[in-house]
Amino acid sequence: VIEPYELLEVNGYAVTALPATHGTRHPVVYIIEKDGKTIFSCHDSGYPKPPVLEWLGKCGKKFDLVSYDCTHGDMDPVEQWGENASHMGLKRNIILRDKLREFGLYKPGTVDIVTHFSHNGPKVGYDDITRLAKEHGFIAAYDGMTVEI
């Protein structure tokens, strides 16, 4: 069992779970590290709560890739439903990316990906998401996508 904020070694990967904002009992998102590369997988979650942001601000990691939840397309679910919104959209992804950069967690060339799309918001068609993502420096994920970092 992985506990929030604790590093666990899993088959050569260093995995740190962080509490997610989601409607399930103990949701988590992950920081995954291997061979000098670091990924922050923060999808299937809403915007991180203050304790998670505080931890991120002090963790000293440098992300090669960040995968963002974009369930709500071009909508900001925090504006719509409040801070307990269990998913994000592109507007909230931009806010989180700016915060991660402010914390110094980005390297030159960090890859930003949006994923976990659904019908729950405006402009959620893949063509819309791809265009909007590109306009803001994100890559829209697709089935079978691979990324070299």
Please name every model-derived segment.
Residues 1-58, 145-149:
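Core dinuclear metal-dependent hydrolase active-site scaffold
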Residues 49-145:
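Cap/insert and terminal regions of metallo-dependent hydrolase folds
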